Amino acid sequence: MNNLKKKKNPSARELAVTVICTVTQQGKSLTEALTLADVLEPRDKAFCREICYGTIRWYSRLEGLLNLLLKKPFKAKDSDIKVLILTGLYQIIYLSTPDHAAVSETVSTCSAGRKSWAKGVLNGVLRNFLRNRATLEKSIDAQLNQQFSHPTWLIQQLQKDWGDQLSHILQANNQHPPMSIRVNEKAISRHQYVKQLDEAAIKTHENPFNSVGLTLDQAVNVDQLPGFWQGTCSVQDSAAQLAASLMKVEDNQRILDVCAAPGGKTAHLLESTNDSNALTAIDIDELRNQRVIENLTRLNLKADVLTVDALETAEWFDQQPFQRILLDAPCSATGVIRRHPDIKLLRQASDIKALVELQSQLLEAIWPLLEKGGRLLYATCSILSAENSQQIANFVSRHTDAQPVTIDAQWGQACEFGRQILPGQDNMDGFFYACLTKT
C-alpha cells in the first residue's frame, strides 16, 4: 500500500513510487501506470519517467542489493518504502546526481507521508550502501540474473535459443532505445523532411534499410516534429518499418492486416501503396482500434477498420480472398524490453506456451483467407524461437501449400524460416519476419 502520496501536489519521486508500485503490485504496464504522472510539470514529469523506467529496468539488481543491506525484509504494507529505497539506489548508481543529494532527496520524500518513522531506515540503508558499494555490487553481479536484471527463466531460454549471443542481448535490453520516425511519403519526401528537421535543430540519420526512416540523435516530444499533427511523420522503430516492403504489395490488391492496432504498420502499408488497393485492418480490442482510426485520420489515410476476433472468420470474412496478409501476431514482446522494461517483471515463463498456441490458431484461421499465389507476412517483436522460426516450421509442416520465401536482406540474421533481428542490431528493436506464399 502506498501511503507516501498524501499531498495535493505530490513530488515527482512520490509519484514515481506510486507508478512503480502500480506495476509491481497490480501488474499494470508501465505505460499505463505512467499516466499518473500527467499531473506534473514537464520537467518533473521527465524526472519521474527517468526514475520509473530506470528503477523498473534494474529492478532485480536493485532489489538484490537491498536484500543484502536489510536485516529483514519489509512487510507487505511497507512495500512503498522498499520501492522508495530502490529509487534512491537507482539514482545513486545510474544517474549523475551527487550521492549526498540523492540520499537527502530520497529521505525527504518519506517526510511527505505517514511513514516518517522510515526516515532513519532509508538514511541508514543508503549510507551503508555508499560505504560498501564496491563489495555489494561485486557480490550481486556474480549472478547473471541480477547482474543484468532479467528473470532466470528468460535467461535460460535465451541461452538455449541464442547461445553465445546471450550477453549481447542482455546488455542491449538494458540500453536506452533511440527514437525513430517514419516519414509519410504521400505528404513529403524524406530528403525534404530532413531539411525541415534541420531548421528545427533536430538532428537525425537515415535508416539505411528503407527510404522513409529516420533515427533522431536525441528524442523529442512529437509536438516538436514539424507537421506531425498534419501527418508528415509517425513514431515507429526502424525494425517495424521493414514490414511494408516485405509485403511487396502490387496494384489493385486486397490487403488484410491482422492484429493491426495501434496501426503503425497499417499506415505504412497505405503510405507506400497507391489508392487502387483496399486494406482491411482488424483487431479484437475496440479501444486500441480507436488508436488505428486516430492515426489514419492524422495521416489522411483510409482503411476499413474492424473490431473483430480474427479467429472467428465466419463472422466477418466476406468470402473475397486477400492477395496480401500481414499477421502481426501477439507475442512475448521479448524483443522490445529496452522500450518496455516492465516486461521483465510482468512476463512469466508460463505465458509463452499460451502465446505460441494463440499464434498457431491465428495462422490456421487466417491462411484460408489468402488467395492462391498470395503472400502472408508473419511478424512478431519476440526473440524466442518458439514464437518465430519454430512456429513457422510447424505451420509449414502441416500445410503443403505453404511455401517459405527467403528474405534476402542486409539486416538481422537468417533463421531456418524467416529472419531475426536481435535487440540493438543496427540500432533496432528485436523483431522477426517470415514470408509465406500459397501454392
Predicted regions and their residues:
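S-adenosylmethionine
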Residues: 1-439
